[in-house]
Amino acid sequence: MRIDILATAALLAQLASASPAPAKRQTYIACSGLYGTAQCCATDVLGLVNLDCGNPPSLPTSPDEFSSVCSAIGQRARCCVLPIVSFMRLIIQDYPISY
């Protein structure tokens, strides 16, 4: 009887140690490459220039959250190439990067 209990305990311990570790999630990067600056912008001029832009108030963890964070302050999520001055961004991409 003791051998059965010890064998069962040893088997359970071995199974528990063999289970895979939880996978780490990759950090979401809203904008990358040429369009590397994540911004919340209010005014779009011909899809080339956005006015009244600023950094998102919180770090987004998904494309939907990036859009909702900017929407919450009355602006739209944009990925920009070149900051010209603090209130204007040049050459934008309409949508943040998805998974």
UniProtKB/Swiss-Prot annotation:
Its main location: secreted. GO terms for cellular component: extracellular region. It is found in: Secreted; Secreted, Cell wall. Disulfide bonds join C31-C79, C40-C70, C41-C53. Aerial growth, conidiation, and dispersal of filamentous fungi in the environment rely upon a capability of their secreting small amphipathic proteins called hydrophobins (HPBs) with low sequence identity. Class I can self-assemble into an outermost layer of rodlet bundles on aerial cell surfaces, conferring cellular hydrophobicity that supports fungal growth, development and dispersal; whereas Class II form highly ordered films at water-air interfaces through intermolecular interactions but contribute nothing to the rodlet structure. Belongs to the cerato-ulmin hydrophobin family. This is Class II hydrophobin 3. The gene is Hyd3.
